[in-house]
Protein backbone atom coordinates (compact mmCIF):
# COMPACT_ATOMS: atom_id res chain seq x y z
CA UNK A 1 0.00 0.00 0.00
CA UNK A 2 1.18 3.48 -0.72
CA UNK A 3 1.48 5.55 2.42
CA UNK A 4 -1.80 7.30 2.98
CA UNK A 5 -2.24 10.26 5.26
CA UNK A 6 -4.65 9.89 8.15
CA UNK A 7 -7.31 12.09 6.58
CA UNK A 8 -7.44 9.92 3.44
CA UNK A 9 -7.48 6.74 5.52
CA UNK A 10 -10.32 8.05 7.69
CA UNK A 11 -12.29 9.05 4.58
CA UNK A 12 -12.08 5.49 3.23
CA UNK A 13 -12.98 3.98 6.60
CA UNK A 14 -16.05 6.22 6.86
CA UNK A 15 -17.46 4.62 3.71
CA UNK A 16 -17.88 1.49 5.84
CA UNK A 17 -19.72 3.31 8.64
CA UNK A 18 -23.20 2.16 7.60
CA UNK A 19 -22.13 -1.48 7.29
CA UNK A 20 -20.46 -1.36 10.69
CA UNK A 21 -23.46 0.30 12.36
CA UNK A 22 -25.82 -2.25 10.80
CA UNK A 23 -23.71 -4.87 12.54
CA UNK A 24 -23.85 -3.36 16.01
CA UNK A 25 -20.98 -0.87 16.02
CA UNK A 26 -21.55 2.51 17.66
CA UNK A 27 -18.03 3.84 17.11
CA UNK A 28 -14.91 3.03 15.07
CA UNK A 29 -11.34 3.90 16.12
CA UNK A 30 -7.86 3.56 14.63
CA UNK A 31 -5.13 2.52 17.05
CA UNK A 32 -1.55 1.35 16.89
CA UNK A 33 1.20 2.65 14.63
CA UNK A 34 -1.16 4.29 12.15
CA UNK A 35 -2.87 6.24 14.94
CA UNK A 36 0.37 7.58 16.38
CA UNK A 37 1.84 8.36 12.96
CA UNK A 38 4.70 5.84 12.83
CA UNK A 39 3.56 3.09 10.46
CA UNK A 40 6.13 1.00 8.62
CA UNK A 41 5.49 -0.16 5.04
CA UNK A 42 4.46 -3.57 6.42
CA UNK A 43 2.23 -2.20 9.22
CA UNK A 44 -1.31 -3.46 9.47
CA UNK A 45 -4.30 -1.27 10.30
CA UNK A 46 -5.61 -1.82 13.81
CA UNK A 47 -9.22 -0.84 14.47
CA UNK A 48 -11.53 -1.26 17.43
CA UNK A 49 -15.25 -0.73 17.65
CA UNK A 50 -17.60 0.23 20.42
CA UNK A 51 -21.04 -1.30 20.56
CA UNK A 52 -24.09 -1.07 22.75
CA UNK A 53 -24.33 -4.52 24.34
CA UNK A 54 -27.96 -3.88 25.27
CA UNK A 55 -29.10 -3.20 21.72
CA UNK A 56 -27.09 -5.51 19.52
CA UNK A 57 -23.98 -7.63 19.88
CA UNK A 58 -21.68 -7.24 16.86
CA UNK A 59 -22.04 -9.90 14.20
CA UNK A 60 -18.45 -11.15 14.29
CA UNK A 61 -18.77 -13.07 11.01
CA UNK A 62 -19.92 -9.91 9.24
CA UNK A 63 -17.14 -7.89 10.91
CA UNK A 64 -14.64 -10.43 9.59
CA UNK A 65 -16.03 -9.87 6.08
CA UNK A 66 -15.74 -6.09 6.50
CA UNK A 67 -12.19 -6.61 7.76
CA UNK A 68 -11.40 -8.61 4.59
CA UNK A 69 -13.08 -6.01 2.34
CA UNK A 70 -11.07 -3.21 3.96
CA UNK A 71 -7.84 -5.21 3.59
CA UNK A 72 -8.49 -5.58 -0.13
CA UNK A 73 -9.50 -1.94 -0.58
CA UNK A 74 -6.47 -0.60 1.30
CA UNK A 75 -3.93 -3.22 0.24
CA UNK A 76 -2.84 -3.89 3.84
CA UNK A 77 -3.93 -6.30 6.57
CA UNK A 78 -6.78 -4.91 8.69
CA UNK A 79 -7.63 -6.16 12.16
CA UNK A 80 -10.94 -5.24 13.80
CA UNK A 81 -11.56 -5.94 17.48
CA UNK A 82 -13.83 -4.52 20.15
CA UNK A 83 -12.87 -2.09 22.89
CA UNK A 84 -13.77 -4.77 25.44
CA UNK A 85 -11.27 -7.18 23.84
CA UNK A 86 -8.30 -4.81 24.13
CA UNK A 87 -5.54 -6.17 26.36
CA UNK A 88 -6.09 -4.80 29.89
CA UNK A 89 -2.44 -3.80 30.35
CA UNK A 90 -2.43 -1.87 27.06
CA UNK A 91 -6.00 -0.58 26.99
CA UNK A 92 -5.34 2.80 28.63
CA UNK A 93 -2.54 3.67 26.18
CA UNK A 94 -4.53 2.40 23.19
CA UNK A 95 -7.56 4.49 24.15
CA UNK A 96 -5.41 7.57 24.76
CA UNK A 97 -3.78 7.35 21.31
CA UNK A 98 -6.83 6.15 19.35
CA UNK A 99 -8.33 8.26 16.58
CA UNK A 100 -12.12 8.24 16.33
CA UNK A 101 -13.31 7.59 12.79
CA UNK A 102 -17.05 7.52 13.45
Where are these regions (language model features)?
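Catalytic core of pol beta-like nucleotidyltransferases
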Residues: 1-27, 35-41, 54-102
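Short hydrophobic/aromatic beta-strand micro-patches
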Residues: 31, 48-50
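A short, structured beta-strand/loop element
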Residues: 42-43, 47
Amino acid sequence: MRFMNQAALIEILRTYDTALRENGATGLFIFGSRAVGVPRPDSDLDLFIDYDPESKVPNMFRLMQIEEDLSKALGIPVIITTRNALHPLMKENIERDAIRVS
